[in-house]
Every structure is written in structure tokens, then in C-alpha cells.
Amino acid sequence: MLEKLKERVKNWMQKTGAETGLSKEFKDIFEVGGVPAFNQFYYFGIFIWKYLYKGFYSPWHRILAPTIENPRNRRDLERMDVAKAVSSELAGLIWSEQCEVHVSQSDSEEQPLEEFVHDVLTKNGFWTKMQEHIEQVLALGGGAIKAWYEVKRDSAGNEIPESGGIRLGFCMADQFVPTAWDNAQVTDGVFISREAKDGYYYTRLEWHKWDGLTYYISNEAFRTEYKQPNPGMTEAQDILGFRYPLNEIYPFLNENTSMQGLTTSLFAYYRTAAANNIDDNSPLGVSIYANALSTLKALDICYDSFIREFRLGKKRIIVPAQCIRTIIDPQTGEMRRYFDASDEAYEALSTDSPDSLKIQDNSIELRVDEHERAINAFLSILCLQVGFSAGTFTFDRATGLKTATEVISENSKTYKTIKGHQLQVKMAIAKIIDAIVQIASLYDMKWNGYSIKALASRGWETKVVFDDSILQDRQTNINEGILLIGNGLMSKKRFMVEKLGYTEEEAVQELVEIEKESSISADMVDMAEQAGQEANAINPNEEPEAKEEDEEAAEDES
């Protein structure tokens, strides 16, 4: 009873403080206690990368363009959106829906735990959503995937029986702040989620932290007034505002939850493979184009000049101002002009000199080739800076930005970059699968009659295999493996694990099956030979008699 009273008093004070403005207003999450001081890295790193990824960063793309009419006129730069294109292209090479996730427990054919994990991943759209998330991670330097158990409710708020399931959330770098980490991984963190409602922005902070062997999840809410966003700059919803009662916005969400028996955090933070050369004490990653900002800016300037070359270089015919005045035809009495006043090709020039009273074609030669060469030069520099092989991106006047799609050799820079990022993705997937299994065990979930808790007690091995067919020739890998095995330089098991994507257990099981088939084939050959020998022993003259009969038939025909 006393706890409920305290809760009501706290909620009343928070709500009153937010409505009257008497309580403390938080400008951003870094003013909240327990959050590391990463504000410089977020404001001058992640937020800038985010605006470039979205295609508009105000300090770059809103420039001064003075005119005679308005010396302070500003305009928006034409943009190539290369940051988005580079992130999208690399994400497509890293991830494919052909990616395989194996969760094996033994050498048996049935793998119920793997089937359960695949069902959870499929229901959450993991196979298609993951490529989008990798693209965002590459652009912003990092991101997180979190797992939780959720029960559906009806319109009255009542829980629907047998509706519980595991959900996955994909968070961008600006929606997550790590609060504890070691050399291997981020262990604690806070997730930031926002929504707009009734003229206010509501922000929920979801804290994940360890205290000994106990895992805690806590939630708190903040409210700030809705303000018109300023594109390309810090957005209004980035301001937290005042603390607000959680149950006013999320009535079915617990403020504090503790869990025992977990061995891993219920989220997986992963970053780009590039080293953080901006803040080497931070566990956060950097964007793939973090060190190519000047090149991205130069590309937008060149592209803007290329577009304006056609706009400013349009055909102009300079005519004397006297020639475009209206005159009255003495014969008809109608108003007439010597030139079409609605034709934008004509520009009037007023002059007092009789020598200047002549029509001049003032057309400008377009510098298309020069712009094309300049853009391609900067694209070559960009490929070097983001880890692509030279010539991966090119610009063509007819088709615009193009991407090379040739098969990539193992020695190419692009291939090495892809494999480095794939390693980060593999570790994140393995960790989130561990979280899925542990949540299912905690809530004693069932799958096709199996208890996930009982299955998990036997242990499991997770293996993520990427489809490298878009990177290299699969047949080349197979031929190379056959050559190494034939010369005794590689075991069959190792070849199946490293090149064909088998887990250790699957490789052993497959080798046993191959040995059985080989044994059966050898026995069948021996049986066939033995049967033939027995038949010859019973009737040794059968073949010669048949031969004589064939010769007699041939003589009769002749």
C-alpha cells in the first residue's frame, strides 16, 4: 500500500513539474545520470553522418547565392546522395537473403532448436530487415538489435492467451548509447525511442544493465513540446524535456524488471570494421565515410555545378531594348512586337550607342566532359577512402552513378572490406540468437512439443554462413578444395566447414553418410561380380551357343 502511494506521489510530481516547467528540463540524454559523456561524438559525428545519409546537411547544402534582387539569397545545393549509395551498395554485398543461420546441438537430422530460432527470425522479418539495418550501421558507424518477450492485448488491455512471442528491434546508432563495455563487447546500454502525440514528443529510455548475475531492464519517460524541425540540423525531438509518468504513455510497461539465469545481454551492438580514429576510448564505431567527408562535399559541389551548367548555359539572344517595345501598326492599328516577349531565349539590353543596336547570339559552350572527369576523379578517391576497389563507382552522363558488378577476387580491396564487416555481423547474429534462446527458456516457451528450456540445457552451436556467390566463383572454391584434399593438404571436414558452410556436427554427419554410401556401393559391386561368376559356372557354353545361333540367322537372311 505504501509503495503504491509513493508511486502516485512521484507520478503527480513528475506530471506537475512537466506541465508547469518547475522540474529540471533535460536538453539531451547526456545530461541524464549514468550516461557517458559521448555528446561530442554524437553531435559532431553520428548526427552529421545521419544527415548526409538522409541526403541533406544544412551547413553544406544550403549555400549563399546572391542575386541582384536579393544579395542574401540562399539556395539548396543539388546533391548526388553518394553517402546513401555507398552504404547501400556495400550492405548488399555484405548481406544476402541466401545467408544461412545454423543452430546445431547434435549430429541428428532433427534440429528443433534451429527450427524454433528460424521461426522467430522469419516472423520478425529478419532476412529482409537485416540488410536495411546493415546499411544504416555502415552509414552511422554502429547499431543494435534487441530481443524481448511480448504478449498481445485486446482493445480493453487484457492479455490474449497463447499470444506471447519473441520480438526483435533494430536500432540505429543515434537510438542507442552504450553505458558499459569491455574489450570484447558492449554489455550495458540505453535505448532511445520517440513518438509524437497531441503536440508533444514523448521519449522513452530503456536501460539494460548487469548487477552481478542479475540483469535489469528499467524504463523512464520524458516529454517536450512539439517544435517545427530544422532540416539538416539538430532536430527538435532530440531534446528530452521533462520527466513524465511512464504509465501515462505506456500503461502496460513495467518500470523495473529483473531477470536471473541469463548469461548474455538481451541485445547485440555491432559496429563497422573500421577503427575509431575520432575517439579511441569509445566502443562506438565510425561511419564508412567518416574520413571521406571532404570528398563527399566536393562531389556535391561538382554535381551541383554540372546541373547548373545546363540551367545557366541555356541559349540567350541579346537584342536591343528598343526592339522589344510594342509599336502600333499604322495600317491595322494593332499592337505588335518584333520579337516574342514570352520566349525566354531573348534578353533585352538597353544602350545609347548606335553600334550596339544589333542582335547577338550569346550561347555558352557546355563543359560536360570537364564535369564528368572531375566527378569520376572524386569517385575514385572515395573508393579508396571507404574500402572499395578502384573503379567500383563511376559517373556517366547518360546513366548517372554506376556500380561495377564484376566477380571480386579474394585479393581485391572490396572483398577484404566485405569480409571484415561480415565478421562483425556474424558475432552480432550469434549473440542475438543466444538472447532468443535464453528468453525462450526464461518464459518456458514450447515448440512442436519440445521445451526450449530443456533443449537449451543441452547447449548449442551457432554458425552464420554468407552466400559469397556474388563475391567470388563458388565452383573455383570447390575445385580448389578438391585439389587440396586430393594432395592431402586439407581434411574433408575442414573443407566442408570453411568452404561449404557446414557446422562441425553437420560435417561429421555428412562424412558418415558418405562413408555408408561408399560402403554400400562397394558391396553392391562385389555382389554383382559374384553373381556373374556363379552364372558362368552354371552354364559356361551359353554365350558360344548364342553366338552360333546369331551366325546361322545371318546365313539364312543372306
Where are these regions (language model features)?
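Extended, helix-rich architectural segments
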Residues: M1-K197, A546-S558
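Extended, non-catalytic structural segments that build the interaction scaffolds
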Residues: G45-I46, Y51-S58, R62-L77, S350-Q385, ...
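Extended, regular secondary-structure scaffolds
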Residues: Q131-L140, A144-V286
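Extended, charged amphipathic alpha-helical segments
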Residues: Y244-E410, K446-Y450, L455, V465
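A glycine-biased, small/acidic residue-tolerant capping/turn segment at secondary-structure junctions
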Residues: K431-E461, V508-Q509
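Short, basic interhelical loop/turn and adjoining N-cap
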Residues: L500-Q509
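Extended, compositionally biased alpha-helical segments that mediate assembly or anchoring
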Residues: Q509-S558
